[in-house]
């Protein structure tokens, strides 16, 4: 499999450091609010990569952190009159609700920054001992210029970074580019004891510590949104590699931005959607499918029209699968179209896998999936049970890689006995050629929310949605 490595700006063949095992670290949310659809993109994209690795037989150690102490969290907690820890616990649980509904698999571990403070202090002390960090009035800063390769991820030199730097008002720093490893205690903020006085860790050191603690000093893949390349991931590399002398991550993967109606998503513009708002109105898998119909590195434009289109497309997959289940019950033992459908499915599956192998090209892969649905719909009514079962299993197999077709609608609600009895009465009326009575029962079923479809394999009942 080839993956685009931000570090080298090329697609590279992926080989894990340890045979049969992939170690991934994905930057998780700051848990001060409900996750928005911009947060959802890396969740869905890198969950899909994980699923594909597992499909290929790898064991995946998947670590995704929670940033549970940070300026936004402190401000909101103070505003609500609760502790940062209470705020974090509330929104971590809300995160799990949203992620579960999006079929995002649970991480191997979700470490919380506040539970790893001792290890952060130890890493900061190590950087001080090696001359890469210094203390100023209880703050600890990283000496950016001492790390010769600073800028290698964002592909900028120190002068370019200086020109675009937001200068910290703390004039005691040796250099405006130096960044905080530890922040001295301020009024109204949570704090922990350290050799430099009470305070809290900087954001960047949190991820370095959690990644190395649970995955080792060099990991296979570090991933996150494009907005994290600089300064967050650049700073992670600097402090981690300065401390260990080893490469921090072999592959750096970044997903593109999500725009709303072709404008950058922002609360101030009023074009801001939480995941919860979308999945309460639309099928959660529609949001997942929408995200995967674009290449993960490209910008993605979100609109309600597009999510509605994704929901219609998702319905086509579910309908195809449900139809296969129905046809299998009454299928013939053989058919002249068996070979045609099998060949089409095998060819499209191969193309799907090729697309996934090429830098996780889910945009192409979903295209082949819908081609497969069309082929199945074309031939399914005249295929054997064996071929239909093969089609159903393959469709399910590929959808499971994408994380869809997992909230199986047909199983959500059993058809009431009253409806089944009416359908049987209608079947008896049709056998007796009493078509007026059959039509009357059909209309009654429709008024009760069900339609009946007469097929060569029997009567199919569908709930009107």
Curated annotation (Swiss-Prot):
Gene3D superfamilies: Cysteine-tRNA ligase, C-terminal anti-codon recognition domain, HUPs. The keyword Nucleotide-binding applies. GO terms for biological process: cysteinyl-tRNA aminoacylation. Binds 1 zinc ion per subunit. Its EC number is 6.1.1.16. One of its GO terms (cellular component) is cytosol. GO terms for molecular function: ATP binding; cysteine-tRNA ligase activity; zinc ion binding. It holds the Pfam family tRNA-synt_1e. A motif ('HIGH' region) lies at residues 29-39. Zn(2+) binds at residues 27, 207, 232, 236. It is an enzyme of class 6 (ligase). Belongs to the class-I aminoacyl-tRNA synthetase family. This is Cysteine--tRNA ligase. It comes from Caldicellulosiruptor bescii (strain ATCC BAA-1888 / DSM 6725 / KCTC 15123 / Z-1320). The gene is cysS.
């Amino acid at each position: 499999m080839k993956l685009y490595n931000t570090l080298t700006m090329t697609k590279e063949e992926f080989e894990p450091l340890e045979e049969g095992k992939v170690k991934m670290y994905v930057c998780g949310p700051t848990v001060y609010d409900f996750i928005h659809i911009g947060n959802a993109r890396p969740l869905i994209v890198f969950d899909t990569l994980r699923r594909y690795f597992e499909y290929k037989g790898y064991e995946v150690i998947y670590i995704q952190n929670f940033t549970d102490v940070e300026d936004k969290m402190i401000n909101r907690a103070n505003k609500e009159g609760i502790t940062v820890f209470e705020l974090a616990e509330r929104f971590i649980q809300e995160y799990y609700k949203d992620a579960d509904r999006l079929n995002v698999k649970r991480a191997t571990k979700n470490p919380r920054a506040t539970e790893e403070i001792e290890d952060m202090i130890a890493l900061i002390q190590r950087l001080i001992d090696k001359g890469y960090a210094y203390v100023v009035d209880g703050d600890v800063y990283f000496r950016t210029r001492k790390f010769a390769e600073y800028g290698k991820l964002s592909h900028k030199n120190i002068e370019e970074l200086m020109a675009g730097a937001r200068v910290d008002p703390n004039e005691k720093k040796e250099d405006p580019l130096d960044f905080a490893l530890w922040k001295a205690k301020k009024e109204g903020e949570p704090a922990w004891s350290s050799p430099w006085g009470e305070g809290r860790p900087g954001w960047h050191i949190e991820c370095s510590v959690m990644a190395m603690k649970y995955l080792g000093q060099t990991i296979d893949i570090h991933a996150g949104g494009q907005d994290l390349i600089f300064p967050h991931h650049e700073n992670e590399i600097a402090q981690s590699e300065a401390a260990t002398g080893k490469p921090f991550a072999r592959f750096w993967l970044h997903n593109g931005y999500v725009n709303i109606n072709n404008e950058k998503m922002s609360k101030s513009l009023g074009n801001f959607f939480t995941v919860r708002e979308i999945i309460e109105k639309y099928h959660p898998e529609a949001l997942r499918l929408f995200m995967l119909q674009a290449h993960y590195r490209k910008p993605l434009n979100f609109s309600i029209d597009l999510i509605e289109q994704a929901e219609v497309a998702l319905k086509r997959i579910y309908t195809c699968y449900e139809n296969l289940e129905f046809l299998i019950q009454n299928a013939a033992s053989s058919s002249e179209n068996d070979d045609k459908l099998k060949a089409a499915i095998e060819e499209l599956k191969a193309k799907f896998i090729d697309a996934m192998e090429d830098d996780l090209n889910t945009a192409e892969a979903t295209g082949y999936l819908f081609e497969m649905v069309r082929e199945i719909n074309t031939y399914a009514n005249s295929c054997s049970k064996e071929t239909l079962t093969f089609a159903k299993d393959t469709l399910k197999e590929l959808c499971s890689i994408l994380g869809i077709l997992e909230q199986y609608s047909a199983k959500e609600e059993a058809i009431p006995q009253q409806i089944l009895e009416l359908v049987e009465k209608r079947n008896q009326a049709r056998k007796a050629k009493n078509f007026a009575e059959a039509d009357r029962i059909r209309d009654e079923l429709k008024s009760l929310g069900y339609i009946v479809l007469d097929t060569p394999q029997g009567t199919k009942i569908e709930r009107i949605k």
